[in-house]
Regions:
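Conserved catalytic-core motifs of GNAT/GCN5-like acyltransferases
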Residues: 95, 111-128
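Conserved acetyl-CoA-binding loop-helix of GNAT-fold acetyltransferases
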Residues: 61-64, 70-83, 109
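Conserved beta-strand-loop-alpha-helix junction that forms the acyl-donor binding cleft
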Residues: 62-69, 94-104
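Conserved GNAT acetyl-CoA-binding A-motif
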Residues: 55-57, 85-97
Length: 135
C-alpha cells in the first residue's frame, strides 16, 4: 500500500495521533463494497463530470485519536492527502455509513465533500461522497 498509494500520518512528540490513506481502485476493488461502489459510478447524476476509475481514487479511512480531535488534525490530514493525490486524480471518493453522523458531519463540513449517491450493501446504508482534489 505505502509504495503504490498514499498514507499521511499525524504525529505529536513521535506518537501517531492520526492517519489517512488514499489508493487507486485496483487495490480496493477486490472487496464487495468497492465493487458495488464502482459499478454505480456510470449511473451517477450529480453536478460534476462523470466519476470514473481513472479520474478518482478511494480516500479513507481517516482516523484521529480521540484526545486530539477538534484541534485541526482532521483538516490537515485531508488537505495533505488531497495535495498528494491531486497530480494523479481529479476526485477523491469515500463512503460513510448512514449511522456514522460524526464522520458525515466532518466530511461534509470540514473536508467539503459532497454526497453523490446513497447505496446499500449487506443491509447497511452508505453515503458515497466526492471531493475535488484541486480548488
Amino acid at each position: 500500500l505505502v509504495q503504490h498509494h498514499w498514507v499521511v500520518v499525524a504525529q505529536v512528540e513521535q506518537q501517531i495521533v492520526g492517519y489517512v490513506i488514499a489508493g487507486r481502485w485496483g487495490f480496493f476493488e477486490h472487496w464487495p463494497i468497492y465493487r458495488t461502489l464502482l459499478n454505480r459510478l456510470p449511473q451517477l447524476d450529480w453536478d460534476g463530470p462523470k466519476l470514473t476509475k481513472t479520474n478518482s481514487c478511494q480516500y479513507g479511512p481517516i482516523w484521529v485519536q480521540q484526545t486530539y480531535r477538534g484541534q485541526g488534525i482532521f483538516e490537515a490530514l485531508v488537505s495533505e492527502i488531497r495535495r498528494q493525490v491531486a497530480p494523479h486524480f481529479s476526485y477523491m471518493l469515500t463512503f460513510i455509513a448512514e449511522d456514522n453522523e460524526r464522520s458525515f458531519a466532518a466530511h461534509s463540513g470540514k473536508a467539503h465533500m459532497q454526497v453523490v449517491d446513497f447505496f446499500t450493501v449487506s443491509a447497511r446504508d452508505y453515503y458515497l461522497m466526492a471531493a475535488k482534489t484541486q480548488a
